[in-house]
Amino acid sequence: MATYLIGDVHGCYDELIALLHKVEFTPGKDTLWLTGDLVARGPGSLDVLRYVKSLGDSVRLVLGNHDLHLLAVFAGISRNKPKDRLTPLLEAPDADELLNWLRRQPLLQIDEEKKLVMAHAGITPQWDLQTAKECARDVEAVLSSDSYPFFLDAMYGDMPNNWSPELRGLGRLRFITNAFTRMRFCFPNGQLDMYSKESPEEAPAPLKPWFAIPGPVAEEYNIAFGHWASLEGKGTPEGIYALDTGCCWGGTLTCLRWEDKQYFVQPSNRHKDLSEGEAVAS
């Protein structure tokens, strides 16, 4: 029985299946953890969702910002952008079934035995684990309810960007969503910066990657996350695992086998078109 953690798939179905074959993943015996952003940019979002859903209890995933955006498009709140390549999924006969399943997935995964926590963007240093659990449940409850379109309509925005237990209503839900799915940099006090996307070396002072600011969760748990492809899986402290290595941008899809901490990679089927900054099929 092995536990495999894989970074952002982004619709790269062929690479996902090739990587799972490489590690000899066996549903029913092994467990697959996915860092979110299952969909968008790659050509196979529909196949990815169908496959992941079919795994049942053999998969543990978290929602990413692109997954939430897909739900907003499905609900008629956001525009379907051609570059996201979501039309085959949105027009599929089982779209309702797939997307209603997707919106009932969590923002946070925890394995107490492994001392392992996973969230798409990471865990803000302003939270302890109990707060993270409560915050995840708040958003998950709304997403799984009939009123989820109202939340999706209000989730876009960068404020508030500082945690307080006194936050209420949509502002609270927006902060939680941003912390779990969009966070990269923080100010030294843990306040979120929602604008900088460059590498840590190029970020303006006093910003730091969230994982460079001491927080109570990282003191006791390993943290696995995706979202930040430009890290290329590097530069994190011990016990912090960056797994998004930019498959949809022409990089690789990365898998970490938890038991022996061995990495496996599957090269993207796409290459970078530097003139456009987009990855194209090779």
UniProtKB/Swiss-Prot annotation:
Enzyme class: hydrolase
Alphabetized UniProt keyword annotations: Hydrolase
Keyword Hydrolase assigned: yes
EC number, as in UniProt: 3.6.1.41
Domain of life: Bacteria
Gene3D superfamilies xrefs: 3.60.21.10
Reactions catalysed: P(1),P(4)-bis(5'-adenosyl) tetraphosphate + H2O = 2 ADP + 2 H(+)
Task performed by this protein: Hydrolyzes diadenosine 5',5'''-P1,P4-tetraphosphate to yield ADP.
Stated family: Belongs to the Ap4A hydrolase family.
Protein name in the entry: Bis(5'-nucleosyl)-tetraphosphatase, symmetrical
Organism: Escherichia coli O81 (strain ED1a)
